Amino acid sequence: MAAPKLTQRLSQLAVIPVLRLATRTAAEQAIDCLLEADFKTVELTLTTPDAIALLRDLRRRTGDEFLVGAGTVLDLETAQRCLDAGADYLVSPCLVSGMAQLAHAAGRAALIGGFTPGEVLAAWREGAHVVKVFPAASGGPAHLQAIHAVFPEIPLCPTGGVSNANLLEYFKAGARMVGVGNNIIDQKALAAGDRAHVIAHARSFLELAAQARAQ
């Protein structure tokens, strides 16, 4: 899938689960729950133990329509390893020089972080397909709305602090998609083995996104 189609697909999916978990086992359990909740993309942050191996495993077990993301990519060597493992898109919390070009060359997408107007514009000029507005919680939906007003042509993905309590507000403010971190996984239920609750909680984000798109 070419990068523009990847970006379009992410926009259609609307919610990107961003997994940052303390153990590989917890990450595997969370992935299983997200798949059962009918998510079609997952971003695995590289702060998760064995993240690249998990990424490779997820790529092998899912079809072409499922998008696998690598998050918290901070250097080009790691970016290439993620691409080699099958990542469809690379995500950084800040501008990583050359990462977008690496993704372009591989036909993959790059989501580059920025928060201020200058950082957002720099990420876009660097070649980001989507700008990850991070940490979104520092400014909330009002900040995103202000950024969107200045750069209406730039696809924005607020990440960091997005929850089921404010997801609708982020879409109203101009988000093309949202990245949801550990709010999407009920950690206590996961640890207790209550898969049904974890799945239902995660699925509620998809339902809210569908509601936002219908408005």
Each predicted region: which residue ranges?
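Conserved N-terminal beta1-alpha1 strand-loop-helix module at the mouth
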Residues: 1-86, 105, 153, 164-165, ...
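Glycine-rich beta-to-alpha transition loops that act as phosphate-gripper elements at the mouths
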Residues: 20-22, 48, 68-76, 92-96, ...
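Catalytic cores of alpha/beta
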Residues: 30, 75-85, 118-126, 143, ...
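Glycine-enriched alpha-helix->loop->beta-strand junction motifs that scaffold or abut catalytic
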Residues: 35-40, 62-65, 83-90, 104-111, ...
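Glycine-rich phosphate-binding active-site loops on the catalytic face of alpha/beta enzymes
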Residues: 89-102, 133-141, 175-195
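Shared catalytic-loop signature of beta/alpha-barrel
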Residues: 122, 138, 143-157
